[in-house]
UniProtKB/Swiss-Prot annotation:
Species in which this protein is naturally found: Maricaulis maris (strain MCS10) (Caulobacter maris)
InterPro entries per record: SecB (IPR003708), SecB-like_sf (IPR035958)
Name of protein: Protein-export protein SecB
Gene Ontology cellular-component annotations: cytoplasm
Phylogenetic lineage: Bacteria, Pseudomonadati, Pseudomonadota, Alphaproteobacteria, Maricaulales
PANTHER family found in the cross-reference section: PROTEIN-EXPORT PROTEIN SECB, PTHR36918
Amino acid sequence: MTDAPNTPADNAAAQAPQLRVLAQYVKDLSFENPGAPETLRPGQQAPAIDLAIDVQARTAGEDTFEVVLTVNAKASRDESVVFIAELSYAGLFQLANVGETDREPFLLIECPRLIFPFARRVLADATRDGNFPPLMLDPVDFAGLYRAQLAKRAAAAPGSESNGNGDPAAAN
């Protein structure tokens, strides 16, 4: 008797949500340094940084999804643009044992949380290579960003509740 019966713990582990990172990559990267070399002179005040972060998800196959984290940074000093950095960093994820209602939060909270450190490094390297101090992004509250997306969706459709069905296409 080498076959052991399945225990409840075995069944629970088999049904636990699983997330696999299949790939991660720079989808699009742009760095503009329009005022160089004037903006690179020593002794100038640090530029003000405007930052925008967005997350989108789309189906890429059966139980496979592409999640794109987009970061736009615009640095300005005295009403002139110092640099513009735009990054779309993506991950290809495989989900298993994730219900329809939980899929969207998984894709828009957990997946970007996993790829964020890599996107941050790419952006820091790009700004450093533009002869500026590396732009080190603070950690992002992806759950808060997701809640803001839900609120925006609910406001855009008065009288209707947010999708909530986990359809990643709704995140686009």
